[in-house]
Each structure stands twice: as structure tokens, then as C-alpha cells.
Amino acid sequence: QMPGSGGSARVVRLIGMTRAKDMVMLGKRVPALEAKEIGLLTDVAPDSEALTEMIIDYASKLNALAPLSMRSLKRVLNAALDSPLSVALDVEGHSYEKLRWTEDYMEGINAFSERRKPNYKGK
């Protein structure tokens, strides 16, 4: 019944100690809608066709974003969860300062002021 690969640590962070103990210690299976309600899932698809559409839509949205910013944001969010606040703030500040000098940063600003979609290059 012991979760592997850090599952016990992750589930506590996602749904809290009480729910995690109930679910993990009793080996409870959580239905999809309940998993969404308690924060284990962000969305639920009614069938495989809808799931495929949701995945394509999600991937399209991610693909339209600035890749350097997304990579940095992932690191910042992970630091926010795993580090003291002072460390997380340092990681965020350093990441922001580094991104300010990229071509993608300027493309985002220019696209906003020109009221057009940005064309990010990952540079």
C-alpha cells in the first residue's frame, strides 16, 4: 500500500493531510469527478473523443506561449512549492531578470502594443 516515486509526498501537497491519509491508507479509488473536485485533476473528459480534443486544445494553448517563459515559470512554481519563501522569491526575481533580456520578451511587448499575437522564437 506504500505509494512509490514520491506519491505520498505529492498527494499531501495536492489535497491535504486528512484526505491524503484517507485515500492512501485505505487504498481508496477516487472517481474522476471527485478527483477534480479535490484538486487531483484539472479537468475530466466524458469520453475518449472529448479527451483527445481537450489534449489537442491544451497543447495548442501551451504551444502559443513563450517557451523560455514557460520553462522558467515551471522552475519558479516548483521552487515556490519546495523552498522557503525567501528562496522562491529569489528564484522568481532571477528568472524574471534573465527573461527581460530575451528576444521573446520584446516580442511579447511589441505584440501587445501592436495588438497582434506574438510570434515567439525561444530566444
Q: What do the PLM-derived regions correspond to, one by one?
A:
Residues 38-39, 115:
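Structural motif
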Residues 41-90, 119-123:
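C-terminal long alpha-helix characteristic of the crotonase
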Residues 1-24, 38, 54, 58:
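CoA-thioester-processing core
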Residues 23-24, 76-80, 95-100:
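Helix-loop "lid/cap" segments that line or gate small-molecule binding pockets
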Residues 101-105, 111:
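Interdomain hinge/lid region at the active-site interface
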